[in-house]
Structures are given as structure tokens and as C-alpha cells.
Amino acid sequence: MAAFIKDSFWGQIIYRLSGRKLFRHNDELPDYVVPEKYLLDPKEEVLNSSDKSQSSENKEQTEGDQATIQNEPASEHIIVTWDGDDDPENPYNWPFAWKAIAAMQIGFLTVSVYMASAIYTPGVEEIMNQFNINSTLATLPLTMFVIGYGIGPLFWSPLSENSRIGRTPLYIITLFIFFILQIPTALSNHIAGLSVLRVIAGFFAAPALSTGGASYGDFIAMHYYSIALGVWSIFAVAGPSIGPLIGAAVINRSHDADGWRWSFWFMAILSGVCFIVLSFSLPETYGKTLLRRKAERLRKLTGNNRIISEGELEDGHKTTSQVVSSLLWRPLEITMLEPVVFLIDIYIALVYSIMYLIFESVPIVYAGIHHFTLVEMGATYVSTIIGIIIGGAIYLPTVYYKFTKKLLAGQNVTPEVFLPPAIFGAICMPIGVFIFGWTSSPDINWFVPLIGMALFAVGAFIIFQTLFNYMAVSFKVEYLASVFSSNAFFRSVSAGAFPLFGRALYNNLSIDKFPVGWGSSILGFISLGMIAIPVFFYLNGPKLRARSKYAY
């Protein structure tokens, strides 16, 4: 764990405050041998290489050197890379246990902030009574939080890929602000103030959502990345699913009209614990940031200012207009010009929105029809977690045999390998919605609608995973942050807006004994139509990629 603390948020601060004496790296230890390339003047190296030929032995040594030299007169840099393929400071070379610990920490962060969206739901009735407002206004803080973490990725995703910043400082600083915001939120006495605080909290919760999956890719090889992304997504989807149960439990335990406030006190405690743990133990994982720090250390060690990292070169050449473009314009441009991104954004936004509408309909079914207590009603949301686990049990082996195993065997794999499972998930989702809607009746056992919720979760999870991976392997790496940030924006804004009219949708279409039947049917029929999207990609994917300037 000492290695983790060394590259953690506080570890880096202590390192610098101690004058680089504490938490030193391998290249700062007395027995470290500086590679010869870092000691040479690039001009001298260019002259030497042009004046005399090298033996085959020297060529092999040059190919194995840990720095590549750009011979252009304009650059004359020594580019820092890892000390060999087995450099222990390269996150890809971490032992499995280290990778598992880092993955669990990022998963803990994701759950800790992501459950804040739906933990608010059980307190809606109390807020309506206390503030004397209707259900639409009472739902507004939920909407604002979701919209907040939809806007956040447009800003945070590009910053996380700047070598000067990296992943961990962004996680820790925004997590601290998120933690602080829970205090005034819990003390709020007006729905407007509550809504404003929630949208700000959602904005600062966004890095876990927008960058968590990318962090897994920093230390997990491409062959296994699809599986790792599936594991991270279980954390991401489990957060909103267990939020209502925890919210119901803390509200019920408070025994007063202000019980809803305890949802936010709980979030303050949880995010505070998460901040303390991760700020001391979550290491930096972004390779370009780690190499930038290494370049700084080598410049100090050797006095050679020509030593530079790839990240420093990239960031130094970006103009203000390029930064603004990557932050705001490129995600919009890709969404408008790429049919794949546009259609997947619409589909994922629908899936996300239906999930939050189902969360809104649960009180109608289980409090209104079956007369469940607040905690009993909160427990019904566990069915979505069960569905997610089942979806993962289907998806993970499938992607291993259809994608990972073939890559390990050196076979060529096209992105369309993810689409047959996507079609399966697309079929499961509307079936689950119909079952939930038409079995939510006083004449039918309360357990049956939960089967529909679980089946919906199976389909939703598989759709998320397959379509995200389809985009990840279809588009060039330098555009992925924009691709995923546009998707996060679309789905979050849509999911944030849907709950505002969710109650009205169900109430206006309610019939005797089936209060959510026709409302759910509308969602189910729309979902049926959306099955055409993965089918269309399966049939036309190669043609679409061939016409794209952003795709491989």
C-alpha cells in the first residue's frame, strides 16, 4: 500500500512539502542508474548517428532504450517513457491485487456519489407536505441533480486527460466539494435553494461517472477492458438502485417530519468517509500524468531541461481555442455528424429515463396499491440490483468468449461482436416494462411486478454495456472523451426531465386496478421501436465507420 499512498492526493502533497524526501520514487533512490539517453545532448546524438553507422548490437540496444529522441531541429526533446516493459511504476504492470484494490476504490467512489440521485426519492412526500408544494416541484431536486452530472462530463472529461491534472486530483477535489455541499442541502428550507444546491452537487459528482470507466482503462489491458468496464458499470447502476432503500431506512429511523434531511446527512457521512479513504490511498493511474511527473524528477536529477514527457508536449501545443473546442464544441459536433453516436445517445437516454420513471412509479404501486411501509417500499428497488447482477452474469462470459478470448488469440474482432447481445437486451427491456405495468394490481401478488423490474434491469444493463463498448472500439481513442461526454449529457438531461412528468403520465392514464398499466405500455412500445437501432448497426456498422473521420 506504500506505493498507493506515494501517488495518492495527500501522498503527492507530503512529497512536495518534504522537499521530495518522503515517498520517493524509484528514480530518486541512491541506487538508481539514470539511462544514458537522458544524459546526452540530442544535437550530439543526431550528429553521432549520422556520422557513423551502428552495429547490429547497438541497434538492438537503441530499440530497447527507454527514451526516444525526436531528431527534428524544432523539437530536440528527449521523450520520457517507462523504464522497460516491466517498469513497476507503469499501472499496467501492477500486481493483480493492486489493480483489484484500485478498481474497488473507484467503484466505491462511484457508488458513494451516484446513489445521491435516487436517495432523495423516498422523501418526496415529506417535502411536499413541509414545503406545501406539488409532486412536480418536489421532484425538481432529483431532476436538477441528474442534469448537473449530465453537464459535468463536458467539463471534467477533457480535464482528466490533461497530463498536468490527471485523474486523482480531479476525483478528490470534486469529491470534497460534493461532501461540503451535502451540509447546506440538508439544512435547506426552500425548494429553490434545495434545487440549486442539488444541481451544483450533481456537477461535482460527475467525475466518478464520466471518468471512472476511463480510469479502469489506465491499468487494465485492452483485452480485458470490456470485462472491467462491465464490472465498473455494476457499481454505477447499483448506486441509484440502492439509494431509495437507504433513503427510506434513514428517513424511517428519524421519526420526524424532517426525516428527508437525513438522506443528505447520510450522503455527507458516506462521501466524507470516501474522501478520507481515497485521498490517502487512491493512486494516480493516468499514464501521461505519471510520465510528466517522472520527466520533472529526471530534469531535476540530471539538470537536462531537454527531458520532456509526451503529455507536456501535447498540452503545451494546445491553444485556448483548441481547449474550448475540446470542452464544448467537439462533443456536439460528433453527436451531430455521427449517426452511431446520435442514435446511441437517444437510445441510452431512453433507457436511463425509463429507469427513473420506474423509480417514480414504485410509490404508486407499492405504497398506493399494496400499502407497503417506507422501508418495505425501498426494499423493492433491490430487484433492479438483482437484475443487474443477472445481466452481468450473462454479459461478462459472453464478452469474454466473443471479444477478449479472440483478442488474446490474435484474431481480428469487429465492433459488431457486441450487437447480438445488445439486441437480446433490447428485447428484454420492453418485456420487463410490460410485465411491471400490467401486473401492478391489487389482485396480483406484489412480487410479480418485481420480476418485471428485474427483467428491465437485465436488458438495461446489457444495452448499456454493449453499446458503450461498441462505441469504445469503433472510435479513435482521442475522440472517446467527447463521445462519452456527449452521451452522458444526453442521457442525464433526458433522465432528469422525465421524472417531472412521470406522476402525471401514470395518473392521467391510470385505470381501475392497473394504475401504471397504460403509462408503462407507452414506454414499452417506444422501447420496442428502439430495437431497430442495434439491428441497424449490426447490418450497416462497417459502412457507417468507413464514412466517419472519427472512427477506425
Swiss-Prot record:
Gene3D superfamilies: MFS general substrate transporter like domains
Compositionally biased intervals (Polar residues): 47-56
UniProt gene name: CYHR
Species, as recorded: Candida maltosa (Yeast)
Function (record text): Probable transporter. Confers resistance to cycloheximide.
Protein name: Cycloheximide resistance protein
Membrane topology label: Multi-pass membrane protein
Subcellular location: Membrane
Keywords on record: Antibiotic resistance, Cycloheximide resistance, Membrane, Transmembrane, Transmembrane helix, Transport
GO cellular component: plasma membrane
Assigned protein family: Belongs to the major facilitator superfamily. CAR1 family.
Segments of this protein annotated with the region Disordered: 46-70
Predominant location: membrane
Transmembrane segments: 100-120, 137-157, 168-188, 194-213, 225-246, 262-282, 346-362, 381-399, 419-439, 445-464, 477-494, 518-539
Protein's GO biological process: response to antibiotic; response to cycloheximide; xenobiotic detoxification by transmembrane export across the plasma membrane
InterPro entries reported for this sequence: MFS (IPR011701), MFS_dom (IPR020846), MFS_trans_sf (IPR036259), Multidrug-R (IPR004734)
